[in-house]
Every structure is written in structure tokens, then in C-alpha cells.
């Protein structure tokens, strides 16, 4: 099956199916949200141009959709953003502007520009059409693996996980959806646990998880549908990167490797069960890969 590759953990686990967001076919996983949103924008909104803040993945989605529909796109990224992701956004025609030292600082700048210039701001979380678009890949998971027991998803802002939850719980409510976030950027986890929006420092090296503020719409969906939510360490994420490369020959970035790190936390609970890991991207810099291979 081109959607999944079977793999066993510790020789004791059930079949694992890493759904790849870094292969040519599955790369569209991270693009669907932006495409669905821009496709349904009015002509007036498109004429204004779009602006977004991103550490890379959301920005690529917006840039791709903007190019597809001939819309001007401005993407605010923090200084130190993944060079590969920045280059990808620029190659897609987006105007990339470096602002601030974190995603949230870049986001605040983008929101200010929206007020000043009238752009259509595309929020990375509080966009129903974005969440709906991202969630479509869960349809493919359920079609390809009708007997799946659980799906592990990475969570930064939570839009991807919210999309998966929405689809899975509507069609196959018995399937568990487990969210995984870095303990070095726990805003979404803390918000889910405390049932209120909270902020927390985002110090993770996994830029796809580096969100310091939770968002209202994804949190509302996650509180209703997410079966579990765990935090993993930076070391566990790096270890998962190496495992995926060594055993699956998949190059996963930190956010993409987080689901495996989460499963290893809970492996005794999932022995003998069919589990899907959403590998949400393979945009790993050479320095990040070197650090993972060095174990530091």
C-alpha cells in the first residue's frame, strides 16, 4: 500500500503504519488546508492578498495555495527558521519576511500588517476551512486501514490534529486519536488539560511543534474528540528521528517523529494493536539530522 509501510517496535508491538508526509505523494498532506481555504475565498479576498505566520509547514501550505490561485502571499517567519522551509516557501512564490525570535512574534507582526494593509490573514489554527482541508488525509487512512486501532498525531497549534479528530470520530469513533507534543513547547497540551487557553515558552528544536500559544478552535475540537495527549522530551524526539531513518528509511523532521516518540511512551498499552503514525514532514536540516545522529 502506498499509504503505509508496516514496521514493528521493540519486536513486541503490533503493526505500525507510518503515514508519510515527506514523500512526493504524501507531501500534499500539509498542503491541503491552505488549498481548501484559498479555493473558497472570494475574489475580493484574493485580490487583497494573503498573509500568514509560520515556522514552515503552514507557510508552505499557504504559499502553494496562493500560487495555485494566483494570489499574492506574504509569510512572516521568525529569525532562525528552517532554511529548507524558507527556501521552499520562496520557491513557491511567497514573500518571506523575517520577524521576531519566535512564531508568536512573527504572528503578531502578521496580524498588525493585516490591519494596516487589509490583507486576508490566514490563521494557522482558527480557520475551519483549513482544518477541514488538513483532515482529509484521515479519510485515506481509514480507507486504507479499515481495522486501525489508533492514530498518533503531532500537535503544535493543533489544526492538523483537530482535522484528524473531526474525520475519525465522525466515521470511526472507536479509533483512538492520540496527540503528541514536545515538553519544550507545551502550550496546546496545557490548554487541553486545563480546558482554557494558556501560553508557554516554545523552546523545542522541532519547529513544527514550536507554538507558544494555543488556539481556540482547535482546542475546542481537541477537548471534545482527542482520546489522549502526551508530552515527549527533545531527546525522545531525536531518538525517534534516528529510529525512523534506520528502520523505515523515512527522513522525518522533529514534528513528524514526535508520534513515534509518543508511541514508545505507551508501547505496552498498544502491544498487538494496529497503530498509525502521522509523519507530518521531512524538512530536517543537516544540523538537526547531525544532532539526532550524535544523540545530543
Enumerate the predicted regions with their spans.
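PLP-dependent amino-acid enzyme catalytic core
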Residues: 1-296
Amino acid at each position: 500500500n502506498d499509504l503505509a509501510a508496516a514496521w514493528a517496535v521493540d519486536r513486541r508491538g503490533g503493526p505500525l503504519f507510518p503515514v508519510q508526509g515527506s514523500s512526493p505523494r504524501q507531501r500534499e498532506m500539509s498542503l491541503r488546508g491552505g488549498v481548501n481555504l484559498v479555493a473558497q475565498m472570494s475574489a475580493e479576498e484574493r485580490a487583497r492578498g494573503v498573509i500568514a505566520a509560520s515556522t514552515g509547514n503552514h507557510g508552505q501550505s499557504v504559499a502553494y495555495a496562493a500560487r495555485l490561485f494566483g494570489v499574492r502571499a506574504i509569510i512572516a517567519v521568525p529569525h532562525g527558521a528552517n532554511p529548507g522551509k524558507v527556501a521552499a516557501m520562496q520557491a513557491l512564490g511567497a514573500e518571506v519576511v523575517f520577524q521576531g525570535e519566535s512564531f508568536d512574534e512573527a504572528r503578531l507582526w502578521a496580524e498588525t500588517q493585516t490591519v494596516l494593509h487589509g490583507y486576508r490573514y490566514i490563521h494557522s489554527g482558527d480557520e475551519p476551512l483549513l482544518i477541514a482541508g488538513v483532515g482529509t488525509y484521515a479519510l485515506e487512512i481509514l480507507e486504507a486501514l479499515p481495522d486501525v486501532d489508533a492514530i498518533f498525531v503531532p500537535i503544535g497549534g493543533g489544526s492538523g490534529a483537530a482535522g484528524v479528530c473531526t474525520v475519525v470520530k465522525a466515521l470511526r469513533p472507536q479509533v483512538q486519536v492520540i496527540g503528541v507534543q514536545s515538553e519544550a513547547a507545551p502550550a496546546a497540551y496545557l490548554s487541553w488539560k486545563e480546558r482554557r487557553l494558556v501560553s508557554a515558552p516554545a523552546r523545542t528544536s522541532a519547529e513544527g511543534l514550536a507554538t507558544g500559544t494555543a488556539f481556540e478552535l482547535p482546542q475546542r475540537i481537541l477537548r471534545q474528540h482527542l482520546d489522549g495527549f502526551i508530552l515527549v522530551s527533545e531527546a525522545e524526539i531525536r531518538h525517534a528521528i534516528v529510529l525512523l531513518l534506520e528502520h523505515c528509511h523515512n527522513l522525518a523532521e522533529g514534528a513528524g517523529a514526535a508520534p513515534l516518540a509518543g508511541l514508545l511512551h505507551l508501547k505496552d498499552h498498544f502491544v498487538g494493536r494496529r497503530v498509525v503514525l502521522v509523519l507530518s514532514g521531512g524538512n530536517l536540516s543537516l544540523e538537526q539530522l547531525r544532532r539526532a545522529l550524535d544523540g545530543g
